[in-house]
Amino acid sequence: MKQYQPGINRRNFLKITSMSPFVFGANSNHGASPQSKLAPIRKITKGSKFHWFGYYDKLQFDPTGRYVLGMQVDFEHRTPTAQDIVKIGIIDLQESDRWTEIGTSNAWGWQQGCMLQWVPKSNSEIIWNDRIDNQFVSHIYNVKTGLTSTLSKAIYTISPNGKWAIGTEFSRIQDLRPGYGYAGIPDPYADEKTPKDIGLYKIDLKTGKSKMLFSIADIAKIPSKGKSVEDQWHWFNHLLVSPDS
């Protein structure tokens, strides 16, 4: 009888590959060890808590390469609830990988964290999303002054010059693409396929002023392959600003 083999997850894959130097196959260099071609790897977080960073398109390192951003929680293997808090920290690679907590967030997920990142073109500002009362917001923390400013909107992606960001409603994402949005605030348009009052907005990171660029209803009016899609469920996800913006 063929024995059932459970699907391999990322953690088990890393365990397996770390135990075997031959997993990644042939090497054309005669006599050279496969591991001699691998980049050096070391763990930079400590303790029993769980650490990670996301998303992969965000700036995790400061411009000097000394300071690394990370998130910390005390659980795994379940979906975050509205009550779960993630801790935000800076790791100093030149001081024995010292962890310094700089804040927390009530708006996060495993896939993309809380959009934690260094603000582009800045060597002192860090931004991440949070939930305060019944609103998703974003914080900008200055590592030199220790001061934090709070913007009235959550951000999704930041312009390359670090002056503005694009965002959308994370309650809508959580409703239609669970895991990529945030728990804690129900989607007020859960019964609408193409709401006209929410969409993509642009927010000035200095003034905090925001404006809607276009609504979900606006986008839904654009035909797909010559056919109307206004009867389908719509939301925005995976936003990114062009590098030459």
Question: What are these model-derived regions, one by one?
Answer:
Residues 71-84, 170-196:
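Short, conserved, GDST-rich strand-edge loop motifs in beta-rich repeat architectures
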Residues 59-67, 114-125, 157-164, 240-245:
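Blade-terminus and WD-like Trp-Asp/Gly-His loop motifs, strongest in beta-propeller folds
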Residues 55, 83-126, 131:
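Blade-loop segments of beta-propeller domains
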Residues 86-94, 140-143, 197-205:
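Beta-propeller blade signature
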Residues 42-50, 102-109, 211-230:
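Surface-exposed loop and turn segments in beta-propeller and other repeat-based domains
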Residues 44-84:
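Beta-strand-rich domains and repeat architectures in extracellular enzymes and scaffolds
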Residues 2-21:
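N-terminal secretory signal peptides and thylakoid transit peptides that target proteins
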Residues 69-76, 117-133, 166-172, 191, ...:
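Beta-strand C-termini and the immediately following turn/loop, strongest in propeller blades
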